[in-house]
Amino acid sequence: MKIGQVSKKTNIPVQTIRYYESQELIQSSGRTEGNFRIYNDQVIDQLKFIKHCRLLDLSLGDIKRINKLCTNAQAPCHEVDQMIIDQIKQVKVKMDELKQLETQLKALSNSCTQSKKVSDCGIIKYLQESF
């Protein structure tokens, strides 16, 4: 099938599919006489796998490593487990950063009352301050 059909089946943009191919995460089955890339059903499964990994915020490098590990069914699973543990650590860091951001935004929101004019807005004054 052509790349447009793959895009529709996977709900992944054509440009992203081409990018994944350039990063050697997938490969086309060949080309048509008109020089269009053609893909088989295995690529659909690979793209769904990649999409699922990206939803877990795994990097393309991690996905490549997992794909490589999948080629050896006897390989130990601890490397994949470690990737997930590392991902959990990264998520915790992001959550801490988001909590700090929330605190900052709440403080900003509290600095502005609805009875003031924009010229008196504490939020705007804060944002105009140089760092």
Give short role names for the model-derived ranges.
Residues K51-R54, C70, Q87, C112:
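Alpha-helix boundary/capping residues
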Residues Q74-F131:
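C-terminal regulatory/oligomerization modules of transcriptional regulators
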